[in-house]
Amino acid sequence: MFTMKKPLLLLFFLGTISLSLCQEERGADEDDGEMTEEVKRGLWNTIKEAGKKFAINVLDKIRCGIAGGCKT
């Protein structure tokens, strides 16, 4: 019985160490994901603002075409 306890204890110990290492790597990956998400938000806001400016210019040109009295 004692001879089986040592290998099982060793297996448990090694499994615990590998599990803790995996959790540390997972935690490090999650931090990188937050930075990526922030960068994506910044890029999305830039695209959205450019789209708004484009839409405003197009609507102004349409309004000028209908009204007929705009400066070019």
UniProtKB/Swiss-Prot annotation:
Cross-referenced InterPro entries: Frog_antimicrobial_propeptide
Signal peptide: 1-22
Keyword terms of this UniProt record: Amphibian defense peptide, Antibiotic, Antimicrobial, Cleavage on pair of basic residues, Cytolysis, Disulfide bond, Fungicide, Hemolysis, Secreted, Signal
Family label: Belongs to the frog skin active peptide (FSAP) family. Brevinin subfamily.
Residues cleaved off as propeptide: 23-39
Disulphide-bonded residues: 64-70
Gene Ontology biological process terms, A to Z: defense response to bacterium; defense response to fungus; killing of cells of another organism
A GO cellular-component term linked to this record: extracellular region
Localisation: Secreted
Protein name, entry field: Palustrin-2CG1
Function: Antimicrobial peptide active against a variety of Gram-positive and some Gram-negative bacterial strains. Has antifungal activity against a slime mold isolate. Has hemolytic activity against human erythrocytes.
Tissue: Expressed by the skin glands.
